[in-house]
Design a protein with these regions (language model features):
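Basic, Lys/Arg-enriched alpha-helical interface segments
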Residues: 1-68, 77-81, 88-95
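Conserved Hanks-type protein kinase catalytic core
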Residues: 74
Length: 95
């Protein structure tokens, strides 16, 4: 099993944790459920839940209602997943 940790800067702020807390209750619950899946499956979590971006950065892909939520993360040391930030995807990629 993997362990999810939230990136925290020198001041103790965690942008990704703040982002997740800012979501509406149902969207937040879905993100937390996807994080449980990520802890269980790690790098084997398939699409549509997770996808590789570049330079070992991955994204957790959550669709809720009309929202497309993304949480970026990477694997660090032995079975640690570091969540770095979150955002709303606005458009489909065209390339």
């Amino acid at each position: 099993m993997y362990r999810v940790v939230y990136y925290t800067d020198k001041r103790g702020d965690s942008p990704v944790e703040d982002f997740i807390r800012s979501l509406q209750l149902k969207a937040r619950a879905k993100v937390l459920k996807w994080l449980e899946l990520l802890e269980e499956y790690g790098p084997d979590l398939p699409r549509p839940y997770s996808d590789s971006l570049r330079d070992k950065i991955r994204e957790l892909r959550i669709s809720h209602s009309k929202l497309e939520v993304r949480v970026l993360y990477f694997f660090w040391k032995d079975k640690i997943i570091v969540l770095t930030n979150g955002y709303f995807k606005k458009e489909r990629r065209t390339d």
